[in-house]
Amino acid sequence: MADSKMKWGQAWDSSLGTATTSSSSATGSPSPFQNIRVPDTRAPRVAHTTFTLEAFECLAASQAGRLWKQVRQFWVDHFSRRFSPRRPPLRHISSMSTFYLLDHRTRQAELGLNYGEPRTRLSDEAFVFRGGRWTPEGKRASARTPLPSSTIPAWKPQVQPIKSQVLLEENNYLKLQQELLMDMLTETTARMQLLEKKVDADNNPAAPARSWKRKMPKQRGAGVLIIQPRALESR
């Protein structure tokens, strides 16, 4: 009985599931596995399916491993490295002489600075600064050299109109600056008053009702800046 079972098992393993019936020759009794018949196609299909699944798992594992290696390499190449640019070359320290300690003539000779004489133009007339004075362009060192007493009356009438013209231009410029400063002061005072009113309206709860009543006069006078006498007194 045991021999027949072993023979039947060996036959099943060798043929991948195809069983063969064998009888016991020693006892002559019929084997209990004679009438058992197993289908021939089920075991090969199961084995083939198992082999296919194992192959697919191996293929998927290899592809996943390859993809994971690529991701890790991409991360190492682009994200894991610190930003370390190359250092620039060191500057060569050059020794410079202290030109600012030199006087004007030596510095001008060393650096080649030659700006020329200052020039300006007032009322369609050009002037040159020579010898500490503004003289009309074209006249040379006549004003620099001392003149005799006989030529002083003839020289004074020429310098007087020029000096008066320069002073007049300077006076007009100062007046213009004064007007500009007054306009800026007026605008600043008006803005300060508006800010004070806004702060008072935020602190006082009854202020919105009064500000609503003032909307109509403000709309009528839009574009016109009304300056109160207090702003002028502050100036």
UniProtKB/Swiss-Prot annotation:
Keywords: Cell projection, Cilium, Differentiation, Flagellum, Spermatogenesis. GO terms for cellular component: sperm annulus. Residues 167-181 are annotated as: Leucine-zipper. Residues 14-32 have a biased composition (Low complexity). InterPro entries: Chibby_fam. Its main location: other. Belongs to the chibby family. This is Sperm annulus positionning complex subunit Chibby3. It comes from Mus musculus (Mouse). Plays a key role in the correct positioning of the annulus, a septin-based ring strucure in the sperm flagellum, serving both as a physical barrier and a membrane diffusion barrier that separates the midpiece (MP) from the principal piece (PP). This positioning is essential for proper sperm motility and function. Interacts with CIBAR1 to form a complex which localizes to the curved membrane region of the flagellar pocket. By doing so, may provide stability and rigidity to the periannular membrane to prevent membrane deformation. Residues 1-41 are annotated as: Disordered. Pfam families: Chibby. Homodimer. Interacts with CIBAR1 (via BAR-like domain); both proteins form a ninefold symmetric structure at the flagellar base; are recruited to the annulus in a mutually dependent manner and regulate annulus positionning. Disruption phenotype: Male mice exhibit severe fertility defects, caused by kinked sperm flagella with the annulus mispositioned in the principal piece of the sperm. The gene is Cby3. The lineage of its organism: Eukaryota, Metazoa, Chordata, Craniata, Vertebrata. 'Chibby' is Japanese for 'small'; the gene was so named for the RNAi phenotype seen in flies. The keyword Ribonucleoprotein does not apply. Testis-specific. It is found in: Cell projection, Cilium, Flagellum. GO terms for biological process: spermatogenesis.
